A protein has these predicted regions:
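C-terminal and late-domain segments of enzyme folds
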Residues: 126-253
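N-terminal beta1-alpha1 cap of cysteine-dependent amidohydrolase-like domains
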Residues: 1-83, 87-99, 110-118, 154-157, ...
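Fold-independent oxyanion-binding glycine-rich loops
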Residues: 24, 43-45, 83-86, 93, ...
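Structural motif
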Residues: 19-20, 38-39, 78-81, 88, ...
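Class I S-adenosyl-L-methionine
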Residues: 96-99, 103-137, 143-144
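A short linear-motif detector with a strong N-terminal bias
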Residues: 18-21, 37, 59-60, 100-105, ...
Length: 270
């Protein structure tokens, strides 16, 4: 079902990390395996064929078999990213939005308002300065490709909590940064929400696919934009790698008085 694990691995490599594609069953069988990594990414695709609901079965795998290892991973200061189906997994497993009284059923992701699979490019506007994956204030242009991408909150109180506690990471906007209806908001997400972060700023989930825009030739109009075009998607991965190097590995190196150790990232696949 997962079908963007190779692109995600490639994006991490471009950003300077060593990435391993790890089957979720290996993590379940060896729960200490996760400890050797610094970034955990749940890639996009259709895990378990989207049976029941998109991301639901893998979310149940996480809830029943990996809740403690993943929680410890986050508590240790490491990073978690969920892309498209991976975002659905993080939400349905209760990892996002996370903390401060949120219940698993307060937020979910459901079918697009159009009733169709939406495959198009969209602009995203960052909504927070605390998420380590994000460059605050800079619009990014990336593709979406999903049939169930509509973020919904249980009620107005749950939505207000997302807003007031800084959980909204990205919103869908136009080229000028303004929110709007379809196709600007491709799925009808409440408050134009395209991505969420947790209270630490080290867990990010988003419906669009940054791993599909890490080379300039992947832009739909790349030939008109010149050789200096810096792909927007790769910045998310660079920021993650930079954070690990500057915050986690340098601290470890200082404690051991040795050189900066190598780090790696893992992407689980069903």
């Amino acid at each position: 079902g997962i079908n963007t694990d190779l692109e995600t691995e490639y994006a991490l490599a471009l950003a300077g990390a060593r990435a391993d594609r790890v089957h979720i069953n290996r993590l379940i069988e060896d729960k200490q395996l996760l400890e050797q990594y610094h970034i955990l990414i749940f890639p996009g695709g259709f895990s378990y064929g989207d049976d029941v609901a998109a991301g639901k079965i893998m979310a149940n795998q996480v809830i029943h078999h990996l809740a403690e290892p993943v929680r410890r991973f986050i508590d240790d200061g490491k990073l978690v990213l969920g892309i498209c189906n991976g975002f659905q997994v993080l939400v349905k497993a209760g990892i996002l939005p996370g903390g401060n009284g949120f219940k698993q059923e307060d937020v979910t992701i459901t079918g697009n308002d159009s009733g169709k699979y939406e495959d198009r490019w969209v602009y995203l506007a960052p909504q927070t300065t605390k998420c380590v994956f994000i460059d605050p204030g800079q619009l990014i242009y990336v593709p979406v490709a999903h049939g169930e991408g509509k973020v919904v909150a249980r009620d107005g109180q749950a939505l207000q909590k997302l807003q007031s506690e800084g959980h909204i990471a990205f919103k869908y906007v136009d080229a000028n940064g303004a929110e709007g209806p379809f196709p600007i908001n491709p799925n009808g997400s409440v408050d134009s929400i395209a991505g969420l972060t947790d209270t630490t700023g080290r867990v990010l989930g988003l419906m669009p696919h940054p791993e599909r825009y890490v080379r300039r030739t992947q832009h739909p109009h790349w030939s008109r934009l010149g050789p200096d075009l810096d792909p927007d998607g790769i910045r998310i991965f660079r920021n993650a790698v930079r954070y690990v190097r500057e915050t986690i590995l340098e601290s470890l190196a200082t404690q051991s008085s040795g050189g900066t150790p190598a780090f790696s990232a893992g992407t689980p696949e069903p």
